[in-house]
Amino acid sequence: MDVNRKRMVRMASAQRSEMLVRLSGKAKRWTVGGGGEVETHTFHTFCAGQKSYKSVVRRQRPRIARRDSRPSHPIANRGMNMLVHDLGFSHRACDRCHGQKLRCRRENNSDTCVRCARAGVRCTPRPMRLRSRAQSTKNTQQQQSQSPANGGSTQQLHVNQEQGPNDTNDEHSDHFEYLPTSLLDMPTDLNMGMDPSSLQVDIHPALTAPYGPEGSVHTSQPSGPQAPSHLRTAEQAGQTRWSDAPNLDTSDELYDFSLPATMRSSFPATYHRHRASLARNMSPQPAHQQGRDDMMVDFDQAEGNPRGSDGKDSRADSGYGNELSPSDLLRSPYGDAPDSDSELQPRGNSQDQGEQSNSILDTRHQNMTSWIRRLSDTNVQLHQHMQSIPLVGTGKKTRGSGAGTSLSPMELPVDSTFKLSSQYTGLLTSICARLQACRSCNDSQALAQLALDQPSQLLVLSSYMCLLASYDRILQHIEAWLKVRLKMGVRGSAMTLDDDESSSCFPTQLPSLAVGSFEVPKTSSIQSLVLTCIMETNVMHMHSLISEIMRPVSHPATGSASKTAASGPPAAEKRPGNGAADAGDGLSTVAKVTLQAIEANEDSTLRLVHTVSRLALQRVML
């Protein structure tokens, strides 16, 4: 056994051969040098160029350096030419061995490893290890001790400084294999957050403050030492980035965003009116300013119009936003008139009465503006409707004339004509009711404000002329339809005609007429009689309303006009001939000429109504 052992030691010292030793079933790499002794194990040795053999070595203790101990000198025996790894020194693998995931073997850290020497390439050693956390903390504390104090009480960090930098490296070098940092293969210049202030510069101080036992945040005392002047700590970064945030101590108009979300006051509902700047939009209003905003809008319950604190209307008289609803236009004509019983009561304060009268006048002025706007819209609709009614022709030529309308060309739009007439008549009735109320109370001031000026009067007359033209065209179609019926009644019944012959004889048809569940047949002449009666009644009613509106303010109220305006449409009788003449007294030249032209159109339309009525009666009597 001694001979074999000596032979093994001599072979390892001379050739530096590598042996693969299987200890307890686990394969490990060992290099046996001269004078070294191995524990008692059974192992197989493979030598270069020689046969393998089995041998058993029994010794009490090995003389080779163990992994858990380190010799006092890098090389225990100068005579023994052993590798550094066998002596227990920790070193980093070179770039080539590390990239191939192989073991890097070298005699010392400055020499070339065995694999690079065999391959004939340059061996680039890697750094020993990363800087330890204890060394980083100690260096940071030394830098912080040199920086000036920022003020306030600070807590000192207790760092163990018993070991120097070399001792620290030596301490970790013994157990380098078992440290988690040994698994990381990173250069030393890549500092992954060893400096506490490097990763917290962008964090608000309220988020980095320590929490108390009950979850409260203690921000009065910093938890760590102050950073040096050339480094930005979390507190300095927070002061720099949040220094522009408005504070309530500096200005009452700015908002304090440094407060928690639960301490921020909600924005008032009326704050959207103030848009002076972005800072004012983001800041709460003072109490006195919010009080002024609440007083800006005050609704008058009697009239439903928004008023200011002084009692005057805060709205402008222009634009479509001030349009009154139909219920306001059709209100009681005595809504603005003072009560007769109130005149017998003693007068109150003259200032209150003046404010009340001013508010009433403003309301009347707004009503007049709304009337003019509605008259303009109605005038446009009436003009378009007049152009949509086809002219009377022969055969099927009338179909092309009504191609631009939304209704069928075979059916006259009588229903749309009556709808627009009702809309126009309702608007004139509202104006006449206000005028009649002012005349009955002898309120000349209110009457002067409600009286229409010359452009408004021409607008009323223009709409009336469009209606008369529409009635005239419809009556011409009914007349032609009745004449054809009369001729067919002599030759035979109209029910015997087929569709082609009926369409050629009647290029236009009248709409259906129904009373509840009863519907009048389209071939009946009763339908023509009813339509002519409605047209005549509408013309008479509109004539009386226009005469009331066109009457000057100083003209006394005539009995016929006032009764017509108050009681509604008159009976179907002959139109009074002096109504328009009386209405023309005191008017301008343009209004007088327009009224004279309208009288001629009225006479022509009424004559046509009477002609159609006689034809319808003849058709009924057949």
Swiss-Prot record:
It comes from Aspergillus fumigatus (strain ATCC MYA-4609 / CBS 101355 / FGSC A1100 / Af293) (Neosartorya fumigata). It comes from the Eukaryota. This is C6 finger transcription factor fumR. Transcription factor that regulates the expression of the gene clusters that mediate the biosynthesis of pseurotin and fumagillin. GO terms for cellular component: nucleus. The keyword Kinase does not apply. Residues 127-175, 206-248, 299-360, 556-585 are annotated as: Disordered. Induction: Expression is under the control of the developmental and secondary metabolism regulators laeA and veA. Its main location: nucleus. Residues 148-167, 217-226, 347-360 have a biased composition (Polar residues). One of its GO terms (biological process) is pseurotin A biosynthetic process. It is found in: Nucleus. Residues 94-123 bind DNA. PROSITE patterns: ZN2_CY6_FUNGAL_1, ZN2_CY6_FUNGAL_2. Fumagillin and its derivatives have been intensely studied for their potential use in the treatment of amebiasis, microsporidiosis and rheumatoid arthritis. They have also interesting antiangiogenic properties by the irreversible inhibition of human type 2 methionine aminopeptidase (METAP2). GO terms for molecular function: DNA binding; DNA-binding transcription factor activity, RNA polymerase II-specific; zinc ion binding. Residues 556-571 have a biased composition (Low complexity). Keywords: DNA-binding, Metal-binding, Nucleus, Transcription, Transcription regulation, Zinc. Disruption phenotype: Results in silencing of the fumagillin gene cluster and elimination of fumagillin biosynthesis.
